[in-house]
Design a protein with these regions (language model features):
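A structural signal for multi-pass alpha-helical bundles of membrane permease subunits
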Residues: 4-299
Length: 299
């Protein structure tokens, strides 16, 4: 027993050290930093000094309309992006898994390739495609009588959602496709023998069997959505877009830290965003756990 305990300690120690170094320490430092503010001493003529201000930075962030509106943008983004991503990725995976699909490897690679493009490059590509003077897509739309300003207040959110979908649709499709490939083929054969058609098998057999993967992807997508930063940042730089420097909470924190040098406020905004992500993650995992427990009791 002691030998097992020693072996477990030896194996787990590197993990806990790494976890502490890359997770616990940065979060702890952000919390500590959020409790302080740099102020000018000597009636503004002296140097700066770090002053303990308690929860003042949190109050300032929550009281700032721009920060609150950033959460509103995130809510709209999540409501538009998450259903499209999950539905699109699952639909493509089901299509590739069907008997009708041909050239699966080619389409897997073609759909996954956008994920290999760095986020900044992807955003720059789409900024080019959104710019009327440069984009053949916009020019073709205008020639067809379809006028849409991708940089307008109404078009900014769909523009960002489109970039994110282009980046992540293929990646999540691969996850769903792997889960579908792991389904016991005898289950599908039995459903076919019972007279189930392709649609019935897809939505009554396959989808319920990949719900665990669906829940995992949904959780990671929610967390990733809260971290929205790169795509709107690129749209904010010199495009004339309605995306402002505080469009999302992450951009608000970035602006506070590097444009206004208010690291305490930036840390407070980051901690509030992290708490939101933690609460949503807890809620999703709790709901998933309850559904599994309910099914277990029913069985």
């Amino acid at each position: 027993m002691k030998a097992r305990t020693r072996a477990a300690t030896v194996l787990l120690t590197p993990f806990f050290l790494l976890f502490t170094a890359v997770m616990v320490v940065p979060i702890g430092y952000a919390v500590w930093l959020s409790l302080f503010t740099e102020k000018q001493s000597g009636l503004g003529f002296g140097g700066t000094e770090t002053v303990f201000t308690g929860l003042d930075n949190y109050t300032a962030a929550l009281g700032d309309r721009a920060f609150r509106e950033g959460f509103g943008v995130l809510l709209g983004y999540c409501l538009l992006y998450i259903p499209l991503l999950l539905g699109g990725a699952l639909g493509l995976a089901l299509l590739l898994d069907s008997a009708l699909a041909r050239a699966r490897r080619f389409f897997q690679l073609a759909l996954f390739l956008p994920h290999a493009v760095p986020g900044i490059i992807a955003a720059l590509i789409w900024v080019y495609l959104y710019t009327p003077q440069l984009s053949p897509v916009v020019q073709a739309m205008e020639a067809g009588g379809i006028g849409f300003d991708f940089f307008s207040p109404e078009g900014a959110l769909p523009s960002v959602v489109n970039i994110a979908l282009w980046e992540w649709l293929g990646y999540n499709m691969v996850i769903f496709y792997a889960a579908l490939q792991a389904i016991d083929r005898s289950v599908l054969e039995a459903a076919t023998v019972d007279g189930a058609g392709a649609w019935r098998i897809a939505f009554s057999v396959k989808v319920p069997l990949v719900k665990a993967s669906l829940a995992m992807v949904a959780l990671f997508t929610i967390i990733g959505s809260l971290q929205l930063f790169t795509e709107p940042l690129i749209l904010n730089k010199g495009t004339g877009s309605a995306v402002t420097s505080t469009w999302t909470p992450n951009m608000y924190a970035y602006t506070a830290a590097f444009d206004r040098n208010d690291y305490g406020l930036a840390a407070a905004a980051s901690v509030l965003l992290a708490l939101t992500a933690a609460l949503l993650s807890f809620a999703v995992t709790r709901m998933t756990g309850r559904r599994k427990a309910g099914k277990g009791r029913t069985a």
